Amino acid sequence: MAKIGQKMGKKKLYDGVRLFGFGQKTGIDVPGEDSGIVRSLRKWDGYSVTRVPFGHEITATVIQLARAYCILANGGSLITPYIVQAVFDENGEIKKFPHPSSLASHIIKPEVANWIVREALVDVVKEGTGKSAALEKWQVFGKTGTADIADKESGYGSTNYVSSFAGGAPAEHPKVVVVVSVRKPKKSLGKGYTGGRVAAPVVKEILQKTLTYLEQN
């Protein structure tokens, strides 16, 4: 990751992070959304290109991460997430909720997005740290995350973590994207603390039940 960041350089890496919506609100239809933190380019130093790809120097919300994966799953098209699908009037009839419009333009080329989903992220589940998210019937794609929690006084430590897994299925034609993030997982439960052991199995269960439901309805 650090080598990729160095190869891209500060400007391209910064533009890519912003292009996927990090450091800005997604526009989801709920109050109090946080924009996360992405420092302006002028505040990046020579080490930023190696730190940012690992998630250091920035903060992101779960909905931002989910949207980023939805962009990949939708072939590179920028989308605006929403909570409410429809509302009912006093007669019980459905009224469509005015969803925020998604941009038709691609922020990355479809072939690049498809390669990331169907090759790179599938390999994580098949052969890498995301094996615990694998399903028998559907091909899962995704990426594990095990982030150190920064302390105000001592900086990044090695005792507290945020363990996550972001992904979806089926890889060939994605229908569902799921992000599970667990802050300070309890090692005493015997599942360790990594995203592959803590969050990936939860994503597997959610995907299994959701895809089964969609198939039957």
Roles of regions detected by a PLM:
Residues 94-95, 197-217:
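Short, gly/Ser/Thr-rich active-site loops of penicillin-recognizing serine hydrolases
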Residues 1-184, 195, 216:
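Beta-lactam-recognizing serine transpeptidase/beta-lactamase-like catalytic domain environment
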Residues 158, 190-202:
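Short alpha-helix boundary/capping segments
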